[in-house]
Amino acid sequence: MAEVPEDYDSGPDEDGELEPERPELPGLHKLYENAEPDTMAKADSKLPAEIYQEPQPETEEEDFKEGEPDSAKNVQLKPGGTSQEGIAKESKRDVPSETEPGIHQEVKSETSREMGEFFKDLEAPMDETHKESDLEPPEEAKPNVTEDVFLESAMETDPDPVPPTETMSEVSGATVRERNLELLEEETEPGVPEESLRVQHEETGLEPPEQTKQDFPSEKLGESLEETDLQPPKMTKPETPEETQRESTEKKRTEPPEQARLEFLEKEPRKSSEEAGLEPPEETQPEVPEEMQRKATEEKGTELPERTKPDFPDHKPRKSTDENVPEPLEEIKLEFPEEESRKTNEETILEQSEMMKPESPEEIRKSNEKKNPQPPEETGPVLPQEINPQVEEKTQTKPTEKILELPDETKPRETHVEFSKEDRPEPIKSKYSVGNDELEHREPKRGKLSLSDKFRKEYYALGSLRESEESIGTHYEFLQPLQKLLNVSEECSYSDPSESQTELSEFVHEKEVVDLSQELKERVSEDDETQPEKGTELQFEHLNWDPEEVAEWISQLGFPQYKECFITNFISGRKLIHVNCSNLPQMGITNFEDMKAISRHTQELLEIEEPLFKRSISLPYRDIIGLYLEQKGHTGIKSDSLTLSEFVKAAGLQDYAPEITAPEENEELPCTEP
């Protein structure tokens, strides 16, 4: 192993920065010093999430912070004597077993100095990421097994004093991959070639997409540490659907479910974040190689789906996305890297949550296998929309089918009508036929009695009448008496059939007469309710006559010579009330006989009755019409609008109406207008 030169000194600030890391490092070093490869495999299998997943975001974050250039691999060949790649491979395979406790004590102090100078050199281009590393020492100290290893390998592979930033960037890029490849070899498949494992490491190293998604835009756009502190709650969002699917699929899978599910769910956000990093701004990452990351994306699209094809059929459409749509995605996502990465990550989270709600993971796999030949752009956001409408259509069509089937099967009203039509006539017809048969069979026995054709016709007509009434459903009361009569006719068949004939005919006629009388009474009662007002209007229509009409009426009575008298005195219909024998001489009519005739006709027209001395005094007579006409004779708004019914109600003369006879007497006369 190559030692650090003696000339190398670290500043006091550098040692002070990493003081919180020192108490936690020796324990972790001893864990890997004394561990053999077998025990390392067990420890890695037990803690895949703690040891494997946590270092990756930190180390990958540092890789992209440094902006790993193409020279990262070429610089490895600069030191004379040994090649960086060979030593890196040796350290990849033998680091856990070759490390010795004596060397680790030296390395521990050296690593602290190296890390101090490393962060000091990174202060100028990246102040914010330097603040992240200063403010998060506990997070680095816990998973820093791989950092310690790559620092040791950095000490081994630095025979010449190279500037610390270059050596750290080189060693971090190489040893992080090598260390994680070693962990992957122990976890997954020991016989897989190194290249495929390296590709898998590059993918799984980026598995927590929320960190990489948030780290790349924050480095490029210079986001503050406060934004990066908000990352842990974003990590917890996709973990909940992942854990629920992990429980359902742990029994059927051999690979670590969390890694595979992360690859399956969030390959698109990783791809977008990596492609967003292809052309970074010149200030922060001037030397990021495009070819190297394009190789990573192409290898991801080609090699990894072959390995995970039986478990995750959705990699096939995503492979075609890598092949078909690299250029548009580069153009779009370089313009808005942060927005695109967030959108794609949110879409995948929404897809997973929507897919988990209606279906189980097995059904999701089946639907994905069926929809593999579809274009890849559709499979992302369109899958839940395709699955959900199917479920909705099924759930909607089932109740509609039931609803459509129910009226066809049950139909209670129609069956009730059919039964009423079918069942009721049958027993009646049977009785009727039995009655005919009995009558016909008994006729020759008696010899004297025979049913005439006329009786038969009427009998059949009666049956048809019964059926028609039954079908209409109006005269159900007629059926029961008819059946009783039929039974009576059967019992009385020994007697003269003319008697039964007459009884039936009489009954039918009586029933029809009763029905007609009831209908007439109802109609008359309705007419009585509506006609009184019309009758009163017609009765007192003459009150609306003008003087010309009154003069015409006088001429019709046979007194045309008095027309001018009525016109000149303006005798209208309402003034006829006051025309009597005492008033006619004032108008110029002096003939007594003519006066009596005109007075009598006006009383008849107005229906004014003279009191009769012969009538009973049990109920004193009240001339309702006379009193009404007395009120109507006055001029005014009330008298103009007054009607007989209103007058009777207002005067309280209901008891004295001609139709009603009441014992009580009301002798008070209503007040009249002055």
UniProtKB/Swiss-Prot annotation:
One GO process term, biological-process aspect: signal transduction
PROSITE patterns: SAM_DOMAIN
Residues covered by the SAM domain: 545-608
Lineage: superkingdom: Eukaryota
Acidic residues: compositionally biased ranges: 1-18, 276-290
Location of the region described as Disordered in the Swiss-Prot/TrEMBL record: 1-448
The protein, known as: Sterile alpha motif domain-containing protein 15
Organism, scientific name: Homo sapiens (Human)
Gene name as annotated: SAMD15
